[in-house]
Amino acid sequence: MYLKKHYKNLITHEIEEEFKKNDIPILDIGDSIKMSILIHEGNKQRIQNVEGVIIAKHKSQLSTTITVRKIVQNIGVERIYLIHSPLIKNIKIVRKAKVRRAKLYYLRLRSGKATRLKTKFN
């Protein structure tokens, strides 16, 4: 029983390693990022640039997701992205921030200058 389970884990691990992206930067909570995403509109494809602050990160190997928040026309917009998705072409870190929380959901309740985060200098 144990060997069967272990063998199954090895097989799934090999398959996941095939589809993982290796060129992803180390993303932390509070980072401001700019991403290029492939959008399909009918039979056309185009690349859309998205930027925002990472407010949450859920690690689960191949299905690791990040939640990105941005204010658009005074409305907070949040989207969840799969990091290893083939639709994400590029991820660039614009600014790193110093935060003390694993999830920044409290930013939903704030507006204006209260949503600013302390910049981390290396």
Curated annotation (Swiss-Prot):
Localization terms from the record: Plastid, Chloroplast
Superkingdom field: Eukaryota
Alphabetical keyword list: Chloroplast, Plastid, Ribonucleoprotein, Ribosomal protein
Gene3D superfamilies named among the record's database cross-references: 2.30.30.790
KW Transferase (keyword) present: no
GO molecular function: structural constituent of ribosome
GO cellular component: chloroplast; mitochondrial large ribosomal subunit
InterPro entries referenced in this protein's UniProt entry, alphabetically: Ribosomal_bL19 (IPR001857), Ribosomal_bL19_CS (IPR018257), Ribosomal_bL19_sf (IPR038657), Translation_prot_SH3-like_sf (IPR008991)
GO biological process, one term: translation
Main subcellular location of this protein, as a coarse class: plastid
A UniProt-annotated Pfam family: Ribosomal_L19
Family per similarity comment: Belongs to the bacterial ribosomal protein bL19 family.
Protein name listed in UniProt: Large ribosomal subunit protein bL19c
Lineage: Eukaryota, Rhodophyta, Florideophyceae, Rhodymeniophycidae, Gracilariales
